Design a protein with these regions (language model features):
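Glycine-rich anion-binding surface patch
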Residues: 1-129
Length: 129
């Protein structure tokens, strides 16, 4: 089963990296049993809930990724892959030049949100966003 947004751990990592909470389109909050629940509204619409943490859907994560990156006068375009191997379907994101060289490529993930999360972390850590 594919995730629909970042996990609590991933959301906390994105906050640590300084990703703007206004880019999140969902939020995690505590319910009356102190269990995390996912709310399909931006965190700004969850003012009445306790202990809110923003969450990013795949769409929100993709929206953070630049269409291309210029590095050393080489243009790297955003690419995404869905492939199959002996482990089943896998997802990957990266930035690739027209000369088939990669600036960065994520690991292969069974869940597309996990691949997008790794890409956002790399982009932020390398000051590309």
């Amino acid at each position: 089963m594919n995730k629909i947004c970042t996990s609590l751990e991933q959301s906390n990592k994105l906050l640590e990296l300084g990703i703007d909470i206004s880019t999140a389109d969902m939020c995690w909050a505590d319910d009356t049993l102190d269990l995390p629940i996912l709310i399909a509204y931006p965190i700004t619409d969850c003012d009445n809930l306790e202990n809110k943490i923003p969450a990013w859907s795949l769409s929100a994560l993709l929206g953070l990724m630049p269409f291309h990156i210029i590095e050393n006068n080489v243009r790297y375009g955003f690419k995404q892959w869905k492939g199959c191997n002996l482990q089943g379907e896998n997802y990957c994101f990266g930035y690739k030049s027209n000369y088939y060289s990669f600036l960065f490529e994520t690991s292969l993930y069974k869940d597309v949100v996990d691949a997008a999360f790794e890409m956002i972390c790399w982009l932020k850590e390398n000051k590309k966003i």
